[in-house]
Amino acid sequence: MVKLALVVIFLLLASLFQPLTAQSSCPGNKKETWPELIGVPAKFAREIIQKENSKLTNVPSVLNGSPVTKDFRCERVRLFVNVLDFVVQIPRVG
């Protein structure tokens, strides 16, 4: 019975910490992903993203496979591109 109580307490505590560690969206952002931009040149993709959401001030191009930080930022969308500067992954806020 004590083990069951400990398991229940652990699960309750774990559920409290989950919202603190996993942020999936930003308040006020209407659109957070752009799957339609795969295969589009990065310059045009950047213009479309910033036109659709003016809060996104940081839209860098990143060569696909390059290391990036894991921090979540509501004002950033990374454009993962190939060597020809075409978008190869779905752009998303973060």
UniProtKB/Swiss-Prot annotation:
Disulfide bonds join 26-74. It is found in: Vacuole; Secreted. SUPFAM superfamilies: CI-2 family of serine protease inhibitors. GO terms for cellular component: extracellular region; vacuole. Mesophyll protoplasts and to a much lesser extent, roots and germinating seeds. Keywords: Disulfide bond, Protease inhibitor, Secreted, Serine protease inhibitor, Signal, Vacuole. GO terms for biological process: response to wounding. InterPro entries: Prot_inh_pot1, Prot_inh_pot1_sf. The keyword Signal applies. Belongs to the protease inhibitor I13 (potato type I serine protease inhibitor) family. This is Trypsin inhibitor 1. It comes from Nicotiana sylvestris.
